[in-house]
Amino acid sequence: MASVKEGDYQALKEEIKKIMKQPGYDDGSAGPVLVRLAWHASGNFSLVEHNGGSNGAGMRFPPESVDPANAGLHYAISFLLPLQSANSWISHADLWTLAGVTAIEAMGGPQIPWEPGRLDYESEQAAVEHRGDVSNRLPDGALGAAHIRDVFGRMGFSDQEIVALSGAHNLGRCHADRSGFDGPWVVNPTRFSNQYFKLLLRPIWKPRQWDGPFQYEAIVAGTRLMMLPTDMALIEDPSFRPWVEKYAADQNLFFKDFANAFGKLIELGVDRDDTGFARLAKKAAEEGKPLDKTAPPAGDETCPVSGAVGGGVQRAAGGGGCPFMAMQNREAKL
């Protein structure tokens, strides 16, 4: 695996695209599982407890690594390991999220806002100390609308954002040996589109008669497709359904809203200081110490990630200088 110049994220994205080709894996592509890795690494955030989220790459350690909801994600992590080893200057947390947005773009989806600055927990002890137990926070496909709102509402997402994010089911498939469910949602599960919403609205879905958990099925273009109870809840709920209909009718609208919602998702838990790096606010508060801001704010140089100039870089989690420039003066470790 090739190494790239430190901070050259565009070159790194090209390397990520290369490792997406996995002939021996699902449908020949690692793309969908890379998106799932970014999603699950971020989707355990809590606004109430203010923990979880993409910072730290906590899934490298228990309890996240053994959370049943994360079953199968070791494939995504292993696909990225050679790239991580060749480019140790990037944190796991940044690489996982960058891989997710790169995969979406490479599979025909929208460009997702992304910026570096996430840090890695150095040990299981550090992960537990700063993150706590964030298990049982991801969606359960067997449940309904109330559960979906509870899970996504904990992260601060609206009904519209919930439906937009559900469009990630355009990608990949379920596995009986992981979630218990089985099959893809769409005919081409390695191409990002609004096909999921179009199929969801078609009156073709019937309960599958099998030994696994309850799910729906339909045969489309000779392919057995499936929908989960959480998917069907989107057309049964009077607030969710209008957004399903809008996204089925307008792929450009879906792409725009998905990009905004996914960009928000991968920033959850990334509490940045004015250098652009995630900070250990909890640790600093507990120890009564000031936050570590050893790198000076960027001046008038151009950020190689966003193209913004120096202190003009704006983020979902707050403003500050370019995180890449700050990276030159600070070790990306917690």
From Swiss-Prot:
Cofactor: heme b
EC number(s) from the headed UniProt entry: 1.11.1.-
Gene3D superfamilies found in the cross-reference section: 1.10.520.10, Peroxidase, domain 2
Residues noted as binding heme b in the record, renumbered to the chain: 169
Keywords for the protein's UniProt record, in alphabetical order: Heme, Iron, Metal-binding, Oxidoreductase, Peroxidase
Pfam families: peroxidase (PF00141)
Signal peptide positions (record): none
Site description Transition state stabilizer, residues in chain: 36
SUPFAM superfamilies: Heme-dependent peroxidases
InterPro entries noted in UniProt: Ccp1-like, Haem_peroxidase, Haem_peroxidase_sf, Peroxidase_I, Peroxidases_AS
Residue pairs linked by disulfide bridges in the UniProt entry: none
GO biological process: cellular response to oxidative stress; hydrogen peroxide catabolic process; response to reactive oxygen species
Cofactor: binding comment: Binds 1 heme b (iron(II)-protoporphyrin IX) group per subunit.
GO molecular function list: heme binding; metal ion binding; peroxidase activity
Name of the top EC class for this enzyme: oxidoreductase
Entry's family note: Belongs to the peroxidase family. Cytochrome c peroxidase subfamily.
Function: Destroys radicals which are normally produced within the cells and which are toxic to biological systems.
Protein name: Putative heme-binding peroxidase
Organism for this UniProt entry: Cryptococcus neoformans var. neoformans serotype D (strain JEC21 / ATCC MYA-565) (Filobasidiella neoformans)
